[in-house]
């Protein structure tokens, strides 16, 4: 049976398998951290181009976080030494920044997690370096559609965790795409990675209920 835990904004939390339910102060902290993450990705849009290295992207992301009073949550996390993840083409996720330069037509996912005032804002976005192929562009478009359908499924009253993965998988397979199941989304807040694990495939009306908390 799924356990839920109501969390005060200043309460120490632990990764204990419970799904955390935050109040208005917690949501405000996450909203600020998430907004900063989105602003960083917005700023990187014009920076990502052929010839730029993923290490330079990492440097720019780190500078923007520090300038905003945040720190990169990935820095030092389980031995990781960079400020973001940069995954090019066939790299699914968690690619490591390096001196590798982007090439014309590359698609790259940039994953940033600023830690601002004790709250995490973890998000990623797909970018094109130059002009992508029709095949690459279509992959990114369908992936984005899957994301929005997953969010829509989660937003319905009475939604369950399995509804998210079911919506994502159904749309992807409609266009003959597979769904990666070795990696997943996750809860966050005071903790970088927390319950629940949000897989990208599933059956409707299964899993824990998604509690709608007033934010």
What are these regions (language model features)?
Residues 1-215:
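Active-site neighborhoods and metal-handling regions in enzymes and metal-associated proteins
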């Amino acid at each position: 049976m799924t356990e839920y835990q109501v969390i005060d904004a200043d309460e120490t939390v632990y990764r204990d398998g419970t799904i955390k339910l935050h109040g208005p102060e917690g949501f405000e902290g996450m909203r600020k951290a998430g907004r900063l993450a989105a602003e960083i990705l917005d700023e990187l849009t014009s920076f990502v181009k052929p010839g730029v290295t993923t290490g330079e992207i990492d440097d720019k992301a780190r500078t923007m976080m520090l300038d905003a009073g945040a720190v990169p949550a990935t820095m030092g996390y389980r031995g990781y030494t960079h400020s973001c993840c940069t995954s090019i083409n066939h790299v699914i996720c968690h690619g490591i920044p390096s001196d590798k330069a982007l090439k014309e037509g590359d698609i790259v996912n940039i994953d940033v997690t600023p830690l601002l005032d004790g709250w995490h804002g973890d998000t990623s976005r797909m970018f094109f370096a130059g002009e992508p192929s029709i095949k690459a562009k279509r992959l990114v478009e369908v992936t984005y559609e899957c994301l929005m359908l997953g969010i829509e499924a989660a937003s319905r009253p009475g939604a369950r965790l399995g509804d998210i993965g079911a919506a994502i998988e159904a749309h992807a397979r409609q266009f003959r795409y597979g769904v990666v199941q070795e990696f997943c989304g996750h809860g966050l807040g005071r903790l970088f990675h927390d319950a629940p694990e949000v897989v990208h495939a599933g059956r409707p009306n299964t899993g824990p209920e998604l509690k709608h908390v007033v934010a």
